Curated annotation (Swiss-Prot):
Compositionally biased region (Polar residues): 462-495
Binding site for ATP: 18-26, 41
Membrane topology: Peripheral membrane protein
Broad class of where this protein is predominantly found: cytoplasm
Family assignment from sequence similarity: Belongs to the protein kinase superfamily. Ser/Thr protein kinase family. APG1/unc-51/ULK1 subfamily.
Originating gene: ATG1
Keyword Chaperone carried by entry: no
Protein name per UniProt: Serine/threonine-protein kinase ATG1
Gene Ontology CC annotation, any one: autophagosome
Phylogenetic classification of the source organism: Eukaryota, Fungi, Dikarya, Ascomycota, Saccharomycotina
Amino acid sequence: MSKHQTQVVGDFTIGPEIGRGSFANVYKGYDNRTKAPVAVKSVFRSRLKNQKLVENLEIEISILKNLKNPHIVALLDCVKTDQYFHLFMEYCSLGDLSYFIRRRDQLVQTHPLISSILERYPSPPNSHGLNKVLVVNFLKQLASALEFLRDQNLVHRDIKPQNLLLSPPVHSKEEFKRKGYSGLWELPVLKIADFGFARFLPSTSMAETLCGSPLYMAPEILRYEKYNAKADLWSVGAVIYEMSVGKPPFRASNHVELLRKIEKSKDEITFPVSAEVPDDLVRLICGLLKANPTERMGFQEFFNDPLIVYDVQCADEPLECSNVDEQLFISEYLPNLKTSPPAKPAPETIKEESEEEERAERAPTDSLLIGKEADLRIPRPMEGSGKDEVIKKLINKSSPPPDTVKDGQIKKGARRDKDDFVYEKDYVVVEKRTVEVNAIADELAKAGAGAVAIPSPHLGTNEHSAANPSGPTETQTQRRFSPSSRTSSIGSNRRPSWGDRKMPISISPTNALTKALGYTSNRLFGQQQQQPQQAQQAAIESAITNVTTNLLATKTLRPLKPSQETSLEDTEVINQLELLATMAHAISLFAEVKFSQLIPLPPSSSSPGSADYDEMYQNDAFPPQMVKSISSEGVALYVETLSLLAKAMSIASDWWHQNSSKPSTSPKLNDLVQWIRSRFNESLEKAEFLRLRLADANEQLVGESGSSLNKPVVAEKLIFDRALEMSRTAAMNELKNEDLLGCELSYSTAIWMLEALLSNDEEPVTGNEKLDAEDKKIIELFINSIGNRLKVLRQKIDKQGVRS
């Protein structure tokens, strides 16, 4: 539905858009029966791509239906259509608290009510915060709502200014008392909204799910420790600080840096002198912003704080609001802005560290932490792959913060970046391979005989599987990549891998794969034949992912000798698929670091659709420019991943076209193909999410002040730089004889990332080579250099007996 259309749904008419997010848009509407204004949260069904997201929405609906409190936004009705879940909610015409804080200087000139409020209760000179009376008013109302939630054993888990909505003040003190409001009757009324993360949590219970917005997230959640309802009190402290000062207490470009800053502060909260924050507010804020939850102020102490219990001196007279139209949304009073309020509050990102601080940040002892302190918000693709998390930590520790907005980067009226269109084309090319990828996977899944037949995983089958059951067509099977092509991993024209050039293979990767699959097959087809199909597929995928991840840490692959189980021809294909799958896995771990920066998830979460896949709500803490930077890099990396996986599936397709007459297929080959199909669909889904975030960020930048003029994102450069940075960090650790196994993993992953650049050296759109001869020569030199380092390191590890 466009911004200017009206649509009748049930007893309501939906009007213009007043806000938007990745999963829902918010519209202004009205009740056809009473003509009263309403807010309509329209959630896109198409973007709820897994059951967990649907469950979150249903939880929000069920909670709101049963919550009746004057300081909680009321749910009036809910209507489901083919395209949307429409939530008709109480209309708060003054927008959210964040918008009120950020836009008050403009609103004071155009909005009669805001002008009257700030004239009566002005902010301190040179302060970006609010007057103490306003802060205490909102604080009392927030405390009232939280006390109600505590009585219901509910924890909100996403308290932030963007979720605190404001309604105009009531018209009399009598009406204020009759409706049960807290605070000051002549001032705006604050209401808590967005219960998508809320859950029932008795006071003695602990939770461990990561949710909420990073800038307001309690440190125990950032550390992945179990937490209780007191996590909400940290968020309250951060909100009070922002009301008083005009910015969050801690700001950073990523979650790890945010936690580092919180811990570095040692509970010493700094307040700008210009903010003139009163002592009693300072005391309350410092009591709430205790990093250790056991030292943090408790709920009863908070509810009994003098600022909340005692009345504050005020004018006790109604504000001048005779010219206020309470049905107009607050942003409509700013004629130069779009109807939709701009993006959620844009926190300033950290300034560049000095060179000495940067070197300290990269110190070897800090680069490879594997404890809770180093945990990152990274979605974990498969439960069985513990090394994946280590690799992503290594990648992230080597990651500089995303580019921040600098002066001159934004120009009004600028067109969209050219590289946006380039990556759109690349994305479309790999997206079009979806049907082909799933078609060949379906065919191979059906081709087994007897006990060796492997069931299709059906991951995304409804959306992605080919509709043609008769098998791939001629055009589907004759792909650009074949076993004899230049880009194939074996054959006379194959570029020798680093393993071929430098060292013998002591452990056959495919033997490792055979053992893993043999164990899995015994469970599937031996004593546990009645195992549910979903559990079977989880076991298969876990085994494949374990092996693929292990290949990152073991020797690079070589053509293998035939075994009794597998023919030479099958072995060659399996070898090629393992090579490409491992390269794709290495790049996808890098891509998921970017993905996780916009969607914070716990490391225990698994693939989309699983019960542990946490809320995929957008990260509202980042300004549009940073979202653009992160998402564009993520899309570029996922395109590289998808290209490698598509190439692997093309090889499988060519093999199947020549061998479809065989009575059965190799279980190992089949499992690899199903794993590749699953990874392709998962990567495509995540790339699509990032692409939508990129489009939203571009629209916000164009709407506010023009598009950014960033340097174009080049996936090859991202991968190359990160591989070298990981190697440098590993070398520093190795010299200090620290975390040698982590060094081995860093070196190995770096080699695979560089090998992927050489293997995937072709533009998806034009077919031209991405790298020139000089680039390839440089990459080869680094592969050899890192490989030599890895060989020496492994000798040291074996000599010291570190593995044991």
